């Protein structure tokens, strides 16, 4: 955990509302750190559980997330779209339970979501332990809009 002070956030009334959307299954070992990485940054945390048999749901609720559930639909797109239906923010940040938002990313992201001309923001993801390049671009921050939906069964994207 970094000891750097977090940048001050403008009051929620002065900026777009930001929601976290996450789908999970049996992520009890990882979900707390993922949710902690966005706590105080997002205005709501929505977790869609797809059939956990461990303490994932209880941990997410303890961290302040709104938790819903559905049976695993067979691919990621329908699950991500269902989670997207549950969020209420103007912008949606999508994380997996094994991902973290770095504290130094908060201020620049707040500046970007305040820009009315932007619809989708591509983030740089660093994968620890990757055998090939540890970096990849992912479209995981976007304005909530009825036309934006997930479309692939794996490595689902909203910008296809």
Show the residue positions of the predicted features.
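Catalytic-site signature of metal-activated, phosphate-bearing donor transferases
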Residues: 2-9, 17, 77-84, 90, ...
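Conserved hydrophobic beta-strand within the GNAT/NAT acetyltransferase core sheet
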Residues: 22, 44-47
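Well-ordered beta-strand positions
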Residues: 44, 66, 89-91
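Acidic helix N-cap motif at the loop->helix transition within catalytic regions
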Residues: 29-32, 54-63, 104
């Amino acid at each position: 955990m970094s000891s750097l002070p977090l940048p001050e956030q403008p009051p929620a009334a002065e900026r777009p509302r930001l929601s976290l959307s996450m789908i999970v299954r049996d992520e009890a070992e990882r979900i707390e750190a993922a949710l902690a990485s966005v706590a105080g940054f997002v205005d709501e945390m929505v977790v869609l559980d797809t059939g956990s048999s461990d303490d994932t749901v209880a941990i997410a609720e303890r961290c302040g997330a709104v938790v819903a559930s559905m049976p695993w639909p067979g691919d990621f797109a329908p699950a991500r779209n269902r989670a997207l239906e549950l969020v209420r923010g103007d912008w949606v940040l999508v994380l997996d339970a094994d991902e973290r938002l770095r504290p130094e990313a908060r201020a620049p992201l707040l500046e970007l979501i305040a820009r009315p001309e932007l619809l989708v923001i591509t983030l740089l993801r660093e994968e620890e332990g990757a055998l090939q390049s540890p970096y990849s671009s992912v479209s995981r921050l976007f304005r909530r809009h009825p036309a934006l939906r997930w479309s692939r069964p794996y490595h689902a994207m909203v910008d296809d």
